[in-house]
Amino acid sequence: MKFLFSKTKIEILKKLNERNYTISELSKILGKSKSTISEHLNALYEMGLVDKENYSKWVYYKITNKGKKVLENLEALILMVSSIFALIGLWIYYIFKQIKYQAREVVLSKTVVERGIYTTYKGSTTFQKEPLFLIFLIISTFLIIFIVYLVYKIIRR
């Protein structure tokens, strides 16, 4: 999945989807150094997304069927990865919100004790007891499993 976060690798895949290229040709077209293009091509080759064809002194790179499938489904993959990051962001927000509520509860209970008011404070915000937490946990778990499954299916095609 590392290739998704590299604009150069995506550009290389798009170019190789048009026709086969050498490192020099890709370097000129994309405006990158030959060593940079070579690094990206080697990474794509290791992932099985491109293949090499040797013709005497020239080495041409071509996109594989797996590379074509990934390129075709690139938008879906980006959407899935974005969804995972959105879920992570929501979880972080939710956890910090709970920490804030628990800190407030501690301050309130301390104030009640200091003032000598002997009423029972029932405002527990422990997030394990909240139905919202359980619903959020279940939905997030299913979404993450579904997203991982879809990514796996797309890459394995």
Curated annotation (Swiss-Prot):
Please name the source species.
Answer: Methanocaldococcus jannaschii (strain ATCC 43067 / DSM 2661 / JAL-1 / JCM 10045 / NBRC 100440)
SUPFAM superfamilies of this UniProt entry?
Winged helix' DNA-binding domain (SSF46785)
Q: What is its main location?
A: membrane
Protein name per its UniProtKB record = Uncharacterized HTH-type transcriptional regulator MJ1553
Pfam families membership:
HTH_5 (PF01022)
Q: Where in the cell is it found?
A: Cell membrane
Q: What GO biological process terms are annotated to this protein in UniProt?
A: regulation of DNA-templated transcription
- Please give the PANTHER family that the UniProt record associates with this protein: HTH ARSR-TYPE DOMAIN-CONTAINING PROTEIN (PTHR33154:SF38), TRANSCRIPTIONAL REGULATOR, ARSR FAMILY (PTHR33154)
